[in-house]
């Protein structure tokens, strides 16, 4: 932890080096690099004042500085990330409007390993994707999105041009164009095309093209269909989705059919609220209808999930969530998977039970306490015995006055698994504490500290048992 003083100094420095910036629509400072943060209460609050370009048009900027320290008795690693988000109000253009948006990141590894020799083991324990990218890109730049949206410039058409995430049945990230056209009040058609975006692969010759249709059959019924042609890493795939959304009294039902080449899956989900008691019931089903061989696509990139050899399977889930006595709520869910043929590492029979108990407004009005438990029972196969996993934890968050939020929590994970001819049980205990402070509308600060104590490295080196992470964020908003 010898870099802790550096962390404190850098946190202060962030307040002075950040330039003017402003808000985005979702009101949170999370980025694609921090979606895995275990602390959810600590989201930055943001204003929507903007900087005036004209009498009726503003530009909104947000500059977020992030420092991360990871350390144990074996090694230390310090990373610095700088995020910039910008968008404008809609500007009149012809018979419609145009607006612009961008989201970018720059980063550096303060004591990174990319300049060290392979014989210097000290620097390689924390090697990650940032270190790899810095090996060939100074400041590891990433453009998450940067596009112009033309709404109504072409009659009844919304057109996105640039880098963006599709917002149809798939959420592919593209460098290209996406056009949606309304054909009356009931029908919308769309088409898109361009190059897929990858931060890890060479995609010079890769392309993605597709289109779809949404039909509002009745007031409560919508049907959609989408086809995509993927030409990625020299593998050509046909990707088709059909979806039905049906609203019902106090709930909704979704049915979906997906076909990736010859492999088809069916998904169904229903949510219903019992009005008299406030009980929420959720039912889910997923089924792989075809045997998947190695001849099917196994593309590993932001476009599709990995699809390797797999047998047919059925997966079910049922959940219930109930609030009671004004300050309490409890949830319970059961999930099971049944494989119809040969099992492998990623496709095995299992059952799972998870539960949650929440307390709102006790002991004070702005207190939230949540207890959770998650148990997996993974069945044996021809090649392995049955395994178990147990996780439980508690999280507490508290608002302190108008300007501050604090939180703390702990979780425990126990894994039972086969190792050579031995059955092992290893555990991981995590603790975290953090806070968020917003003294004025244009400034928000966050700090989060976590510690992980694990048994997994006992046979390697006990100095790896305890790992610490410190996160410091500064958000300047105008």
Protein language model annotation of sequence segments:
Residues 84-88, 145-150, 177-181, 211-215, ...:
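Residues on the lipid-exposed face of transmembrane beta-strands in outer-membrane beta-barrel proteins
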Residues 73-77, 107-117, 131-133, 192-243, ...:
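Outer-membrane beta-barrel translocator/channel fold
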Residues 8-18:
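Bacterial N-terminal signal peptides
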Residues 93-100, 154-160, 185-190, 219-225, ...:
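Repeated loop/turn-to-beta-strand initiation elements of outer-membrane beta-barrel proteins
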Residues 24, 62-153, 403-405, 448, ...:
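Transmembrane beta-barrel domains of Gram-negative outer membranes and organellar outer membranes
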Residues 105, 123-198:
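Outer membrane beta-barrel
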Residues 64, 79-83, 141-145, 174, ...:
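Transmembrane beta-barrel architecture of outer-membrane proteins
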């Amino acid at each position: 932890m010898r870099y802790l003083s550096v962390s404190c100094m850098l946190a202060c420095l962030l307040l002075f080096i950040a330039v003017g910036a402003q808000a985005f629509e979702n009101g949170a400072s999370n980025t694609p690099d921090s979606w895995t943060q275990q602390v959810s209460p600590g989201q930055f609050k943001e204003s929507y004042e903007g900087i005036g370009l004209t009498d009726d048009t503003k530009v909104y900027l947000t500059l977020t500085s992030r420092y991360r320290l990871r350390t144990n008795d074996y090694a230390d690693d310090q990373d610095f990330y700088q995020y910039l988000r910008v968008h404008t109000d809609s500007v009149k253009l012809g018979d419609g409007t145009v607006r612009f948006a961008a989201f970018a990141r720059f980063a550096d590894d303060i004591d990174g390993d990319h300049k060290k020799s392979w014989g210097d083991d000290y620097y390689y324990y924390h090697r990650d994707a940032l270190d790899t990218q810095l090996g060939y890109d100074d400041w590891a730049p990433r453009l998450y999105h940067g596009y112009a949206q033309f709404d109504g410039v072409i009659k009844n058409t919304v057109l996105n041009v640039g880098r963006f995430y599709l917002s149809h049945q798939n959420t592919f990230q593209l460098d290209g164009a996406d056009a949606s056209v309304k054909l009356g009040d009931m029908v919308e058609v769309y088409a898109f095309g361009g190059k897929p975006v990858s931060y890890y692969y060479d995609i010079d010759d890769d392309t993605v093209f597709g289109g779809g249709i949404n039909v509002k059959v009745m007031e409560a019924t919508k049907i959609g269909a989408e086809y995509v042609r993927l030409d990625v890493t020299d593998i050509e795939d046909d990707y088709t989705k059909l979806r039905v959304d049906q609203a019902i009294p106090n709930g909704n039902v979704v049915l979906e059919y997906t076909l990736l080449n010859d492999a088809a899956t069916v998904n169904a989900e229903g949510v219903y609220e019992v009005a008299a008691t406030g009980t929420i019931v959720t039912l889910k089903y997923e089924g792989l209808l075809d045997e998947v061989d190695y001849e099917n696509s196994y593309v590993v990139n932001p476009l599709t999930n990995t699809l390797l050899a797999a047998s047919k399977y059925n997966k079910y889930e049922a959940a219930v969530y109930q609030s009671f006595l004004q300050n309490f709520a409890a949830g319970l869910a059961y999930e099971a998977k049944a494989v119809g043929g040969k099992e492998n590492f990623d496709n095995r029979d299992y059952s799972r039970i998870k539960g949650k108990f929440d307390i709102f407004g006790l002991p004070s009005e702005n207190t939230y306490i949540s207890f959770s438990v998650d148990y997996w029972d993974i069945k044996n196969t021809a090649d392995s015995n049955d395994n178990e996993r147990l996780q439980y934890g508690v999280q507490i968050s508290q608002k302190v006055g108008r300007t501050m939020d604090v939180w703390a929590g702990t979780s425990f994970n126990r894994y039972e698994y086969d190792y050579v001819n031995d059955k092992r049980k290893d555990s991981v205990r995590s603790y975290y504490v953090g806070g968020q402070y917003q003294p004025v509308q244009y400034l928000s600060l966050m700090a989060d500290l976590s510690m992980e104590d694990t048994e997994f490295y006992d046979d390697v080196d006990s100095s790896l048992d305890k790992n610490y992470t410190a996160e410091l964020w500064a958000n300047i908003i105008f």
